[in-house]
Amino acid sequence: MKALSKLKAEEGIWMIDVPEPELGHNDVMIKIRKTAICGTDVHIYNWDDWSQKTIPVPMVVGHEYVGEVVAIGQEVKGFKIGDRVSGEGHITCGYCRNCRGGRTHLCRNTIGVGVNRAGCFAQYLVIPAFNAFKIPDNISDELAAIFDPFGNAVHTALSFDLVGEDVLVSGAGPIGIMAAAVCKHVGARHVVITDVNEYRLELARKMGVTRAVNVSQENLTDVMAELGMTEGFDVGLEMSGAPAAFRTLLNTMNHGGRVALLGIPPSDMAIDWNQVIFKGLFIKGIYGREMFETWYKMATLIQSGLDLTPIITHRFSIDDFQKGFDIMRSGQSGKVILNWD
């Protein structure tokens, strides 16, 4: 079958033929319709330090997808041939304390689809049936293909009560923009997003944020004053991994504020801990999606009117995958869809 593989320990992704995956007793086989390129895939393409330490070569990559169930293992219940599915990219062990306690998103033995085992940039994908999620009929293939990153956004945004709150989102990548849209949709008052990438700030404006602030041109405290904010932000969502952005977020949080941290900063990042301690801030680390509460919330948010379509900016045939990676690497895109049909 056709697949995109990290074939060599150098920059790039290559299209090759690989054998179809084998179906286990508890697995489903999915014929891929559409995939989306994740920032993780760009890291793997670039072959940065993280990728060199993490990715075995060769490896079929990718973990954002939608497809159709075409084969079912003999032990599988609850799925049938023809079901339209996406899937949770974190495969958990099932036997650690968190898994047995129902907190599978905190499994200490997680294996990543397209990172530690073969991914979805292929004509067929096999995953445990536990990881598959049926897509409601009124959600399009394109939206279903971005459920994985949308789940990061939903998990981060819904970490805290948002109704009537003022929210700061630092980092206007696709996940940050989707998180901001979720905050606004569920009843936050002011939702402000910051970045230095004007293309993506304009995407955020299309998604309905209160203010999209280019911090290289505007002062965030001036924006807060314009909005009539007399105190700091109640909720902060750090999506950028940029030390300067995180420090600004801490500086502008209200006392008792709550911070969800999804962006991965450098290991040696220094912050002013006085901002955390004397403000009584609560900081929560976020990884992945809650299984499967986040997934159900994703579906119902879209069904209740949340419009994510502006975040999908480019579409390519899988044969033109290089164009997709080039536009993702440029930073001048939202989500990029690769069509396998």
Swiss-Prot record:
Q: What is the lineage of its organism?
A: Bacteria, Pseudomonadati, Pseudomonadota, Gammaproteobacteria, Enterobacterales
List residues binding Zn(2+) 1.
Answer: 38, 63-64
Q: How is the cofactor bound?
A: Binds 2 Zn(2+) ions per subunit.
Q: Say which species the protein is native to.
A: Photorhabdus laumondii subsp. laumondii (strain DSM 15139 / CIP 105565 / TT01)
Annotated catalysed reactions: L-threonine + NAD(+) = (2S)-2-amino-3-oxobutanoate + NADH + H(+)
**Assigned protein family:** Belongs to the zinc-containing alcohol dehydrogenase family.
UniProt protein name:
L-threonine 3-dehydrogenase
Listed under GO biological process in this entry are: L-threonine catabolic process to glycine
Q: Does the keyword Acyltransferase apply?
A: no
The pathway it acts in is: Amino-acid degradation; L-threonine degradation via oxydo-reductase pathway; glycine from L-threonine: step 1/2
